């Protein structure tokens, strides 16, 4: 199989604008982790793309943007020469959905979630509505035309289609959240702050079943009203009573079209897990799966392309937690 891997930020998606350092660093981490796994698979010939402002990737075939070529055109060129494409991109602005649709439009194999599933999970409000309709516990999510309940405590205001902690703001109460929504009514949502450990799930989905690969602890810093993800402890939390595997199954049933690697952000409250958002793509936790579990997650994903394959559901391996730092050498 000829496979084209496209990491949007480090792979040319910002070729016509300045590279955002934090996003480029995180994207490069995910890309290198995935390429290392793919490099072990017989019969898989991988090509990627590279922003020429970044160091080259030794031993990896990479294409670079041509004069005037934007990220979408670069992706189309790479996918056209391959049998399958694996896009990794922020959901923001519909970027990931557009890449997925282009892949299928070209008649190529998409190693990722369906465009419709990406479109749904891109919107935090739509995701919350879909999960709530299926009885999955999730954080209440409000837009500018909703009446915010006067719940005590701080609230979070964020872009409805945001990725990670980008532009996430913590405000002191529901009134401040309401005012923030009014200031930018088209793009923002507000959610009450949920107390409890910030965790995430790494899932393997096939559109029908789901396998819980790991439960990860997120090390989050809140300062000056800004929320920052500083590090992740991959496979640092055990699913002792099976409630997290059960949550994964309920999410997969509620959101058809999730396929391949999927991330879930949630808070573990005293009443149980509460979902914050679904990431229909590789997340940074992927970078620690090999060290923590001794598995090749890329092999598991591509194995789902084989005829009559189905995801198995063994419990997460015990393993040893792996620590993935998102801080730069400058400590940001």
Model-derived segments and spans:
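A short glycine-rich, hydrophobically flanked beta-strand micro-motif that places a catalytic Asp/Glu
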Residues: 258-270
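ATP-dependent carboxylate/phosphate-activation module, predominantly the ATP-grasp catalytic core
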Residues: 192-256, 268, 279-306, 323-327
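Active-site nucleotide/adenylate-binding loops and adjacent lid/helix of ATP-dependent enzymes
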Residues: 117-198, 204-213, 217, 231-246
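Nucleotide-activated donor-dependent transferases that construct or modify glycoconjugates
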Residues: 1-22
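Short catalytic helix/loop segments, enriched in acidic residues and glycine
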Residues: 18-38
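Conserved N-proximal alpha/beta basic substrate-recognition cap immediately N-terminal to
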Residues: 37, 47-145
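Cysteine/selenocysteine-centered motifs that mediate thiol-based redox chemistry or coordinate metal-sulfur cofactors
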Residues: 308-332
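Conserved protein kinase catalytic/activation segment
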Residues: 272-274
């Amino acid at each position: 199989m000829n496979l084209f891997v496209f990491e949007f930020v480090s792979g040319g998606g910002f070729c016509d604008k300045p590279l955002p350092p934090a996003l480029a660093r995180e994207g490069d981490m995910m890309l290198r982790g995935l390429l290392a796994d793919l490099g072990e698979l017989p019969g898989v010939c991988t090509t990627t793309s590279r922003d020429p402002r970044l160091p080259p990737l030794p031993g990896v075939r990479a294409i670079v943007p041509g004069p005037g070529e934007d990220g979408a055109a670069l992706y189309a060129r790479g996918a056209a020469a391959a049998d399958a494409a694996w896009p990794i991109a922020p959901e923001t602005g519909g970027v990931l959905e557009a890449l997925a649709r282009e892949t299928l439009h070209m008649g190529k194999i998409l190693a990722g979630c369906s465009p419709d599933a990406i479109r749904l999970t891109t919107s935090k409000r739509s995701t919350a509505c879909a999960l709530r309709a299926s009885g999955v516990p999730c954080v209440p999510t409000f837009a500018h035309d909703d009446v915010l309940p006067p719940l005590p405590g701080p609230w979070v205001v964020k872009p409805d289609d945001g990725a990670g902690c980008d532009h996430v703001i913590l405000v002191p109460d529901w009134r401040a959240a309401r005012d923030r929504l009014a200031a930018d009514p088209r793009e923002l949502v507000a959610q009450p702050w949920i107390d409890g450990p910030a965790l995430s799930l790494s899932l393997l989905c096939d559109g029908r079943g789901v396998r819980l690969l790991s439960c990860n602890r997120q090390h989050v810093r809140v300062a000056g009203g800004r929320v920052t993800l500083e590090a992740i402890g991959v496979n640092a939390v055990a699913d002792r009573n099976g409630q997290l595997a059960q949550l994964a199954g309920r999410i997969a049933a509620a959101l058809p079209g999730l396929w391949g690697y999927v991330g879930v952000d949630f808070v573990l409250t005293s009443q149980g897990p509460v979902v914050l958002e679904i990431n229909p793509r590789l997340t940074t936790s992927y970078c620690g799966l090999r060290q923590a579990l001794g598995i090749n997650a890329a092999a598991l994903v591509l194995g789902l392309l084989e005829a009559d394959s189905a995801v198995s559901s063994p419990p997460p391996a015990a393993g040893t937690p792996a620590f993935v730092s998102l801080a730069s050498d400058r400590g940001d």
